[in-house]
Amino acid sequence: MPQMSPMMWFSLFIMFSMTMMLFNQLNFFSYKPNKIMSSNNKIKKKNINWMW
């Protein structure tokens, strides 16, 4: 059984690393979050006039 040279192992490692990074970037940039429509649910503030 022939052995792989160290340079071949390194190129294999680089190839798998680049594939993993590409896959992660594609997953990251393909995600589109849904916008939350909260225009109807506005926070009600109570106006308090402080009299010192």
Swiss-Prot record:
Primary location: mitochondrion
Topological relation to the membrane, as annotated: Single-pass membrane protein
Location relative to the cell: Mitochondrion membrane
The entry's keywords: ATP synthesis, CF(0), Hydrogen ion transport, Ion transport, Membrane, Mitochondrion, Transmembrane, Transmembrane helix, Transport
Name of encoding gene: MT-ATP8
Quaternary organization: F-type ATPases have 2 components, CF(1) - the catalytic core - and CF(0) - the membrane proton channel.
Keyword Chaperone: no
A GO cellular-component term linked to this record: proton-transporting ATP synthase complex
Pfam family, one: ATP-synt_8
Protease found in the keyword field: no
Protein name per its UniProtKB record: ATP synthase protein 8
Protein task: Mitochondrial membrane ATP synthase (F(1)F(0) ATP synthase or Complex V) produces ATP from ADP in the presence of a proton gradient across the membrane which is generated by electron transport complexes of the respiratory chain. F-type ATPases consist of two structural domains, F(1) - containing the extramembraneous catalytic core and F(0) - containing the membrane proton channel, linked together by a central stalk and a peripheral stalk. During catalysis, ATP synthesis in the catalytic domain of F(1) is coupled via a rotary mechanism of the central stalk subunits to proton translocation.
Any one GO biological process: proton motive force-driven ATP synthesis
GO MF annotation, one: proton transmembrane transporter activity
Superkingdom, natural source: Eukaryota
